[in-house]
From Swiss-Prot:
Residues 586-668 form the BRCT domain. This is DNA ligase. The gene is ligA. It comes from Staphylococcus carnosus (strain TM300). SMART domains: BRCT (SM00292), HhH1 (SM00278), LIGANc (SM00532). It is an enzyme of class 6 (ligase).
Amino acid sequence: MAELATRVQELHHLLNKYSHEYYVQDNPSVPDSEYDKLLRELIDIENAHPEYKTEDSPTVRVGGEAQATFNKVRHDTPMLSLGNAFNEEELRRFDARVREKAGKVEYMCELKIDGLAVSLKYENGRFVQGLTRGDGTIGEDITANLRTIRAIPLRINKPLTFEVRGEAYMPKKSFEHLNQQKEEAGEQAFANPRNAAAGSLRQLDSKLAAKRRLSIFLYSVNDFTNFHAESQSEALDELDELGFKTNQNRKRVSDIDGVLEYIKYWTAHREELPYDIDGIVIKVNDLEEQEELGYTQKSPRWAIAYKFPAEEVVTKLLDIELSIGRTGVVTPTAVLEPVRVAGTTVSRASLHNEDLIHEKDIRIGDSVVIKKAGDIIPEVIRSLPDRRPEGTEPYHMPTHCPSCGHELVRLDGEVALRCINPKCPAQLVEGMIHFVSRQAMNIDGLGTKIIMQLYENEIIKDVGDLYYLTKDDLLPLERMGEKKADNLLNAIEASKKNSLEHLLFGLGIRHLGVKASQVIAERFETMDRLFKVTEEELLEIHDIGDKLATSLITYLNNKDIIALIEKLRRKNVNMTYEGIKTSEIQTDSEFNGKTVVLTGKLHNMTRTEASKWLEAQGAKTTSSVTKNTDLVIAGEDAGSKLTKAEKLGTEVWSEDEFIQKQKEVENK
């Protein structure tokens, strides 16, 4: 058995070495047949002796048992998106904002890979968890699928604990191979490599994900505790040394003119790459300067994404279809002769509203120019009258709602036509789709098709009915099995615990967005209190205007809405605010207004728990030590951050000192 254990270790070493050479260094030293032979040997050993199978065995690359669903997990640090720039002027404005606060800076330019953002967590050098971006705060655990990507090391060459983020993508060759297989099987092909990558990583069966030949580029470190890097370029170099795959087409430049030269080059050469890119990411290189520049609520101030100009193509307008949104707005959509735009097959595009259709004189049968704004949303930008066939007529919107037949109206100050019938079937269905969405009640698995079936079969008439669904209601639906029905009912049950702001946003009250829902829920705390709120009380809140105040009061005074809320209450849907209130932040705390960095391993709490406590005291927690840092709390094995704090003369506490201070604060 000792010989067998030695052989298993040897196979691990060889397979990891050959995989790294092929998928990361792009320089294989052995043919595929040799790798496959060794992998087969290891699989056979593990099948005969399961005690030798480990979580980081190279055999996990081929996938494992199918999962029932993906667990939702909160990111330790939110995965923020980047602000966008579409031209030189916007880039120069970004540069001016940076220089105004940080002075002359060096930039790091990186290719913006068109894939799926993921976060990888390592503990003591082993890959233990991988999450999707999700909504930036909560992602889905797709660890099993990410383990099948051979460019992701299952174990690195140092016993470090940290988180690294990157973009999983499908190379062009893998995409072509996959679509060829789909076409041969009579299945619908993927529109582009990005969709194929996202779809592959959301396969519940990791064996299927393993066949999709995905790869990854890592681009950022979430926690620099165990790193020596003082810049983005040094961080990427350290990732290289640890065995991660980073994009080697990155470049440090001294100013915005260097950024523009880099963009010019890759705009001309992007098609030569073996993978898709949809822009360039520009980051301030120095980590201390990044910290000084800080963040907005949505994105870092020290980085921006330049998006390539939209590609324009000509195709034929076959028809104009109308859709009714949850607020009753009637939106015209162009039905097109399918055409490839920016790597995607497009058959539908936005026409916005009737005024724009008339202004551009767009007619059914026309040849039209379409583009994908930001390489994402297709829209019709103009018609080509010189190619117009004889007999075409100017397009006119209907006078009555296509869904319910109610007369359409145009409200004062609006260009859109709107159906104002509150019982319009199309609006009710769209309202339900909104209610279950991620930022609202977040009912996973309850998609458009299921909602449509439930509504058309008269099983549900409003969102309240969702909480009265039974397995017997669900099982007759298309593609609905026992397990799927159970998962759906569990997701509905779990949504009852959501904080009040999720319910408010989910109700689809006109003019009420995510942020305003949060502010109002925090201010008034319960739905009962909201039913008694006055317009004057609402207008006292910063950022709540006349339109929203009037809309909310009108909504809450509607007898049908009162009945709906009672219907939800009878099923124990939470109607109170569960978050930390701004008013509860201890403004008199000695931590209030201080910038604190947590580093090293804490034994009595997680760093997330420590951060939440500090933030409740009015402190701001950040990830790197700068001259603006007031305090560093250093746990076990604190690394370069502790060294830097000592160098800057920043106050440093041990975990024991921090716990003692917590007790003093809480006993005041």
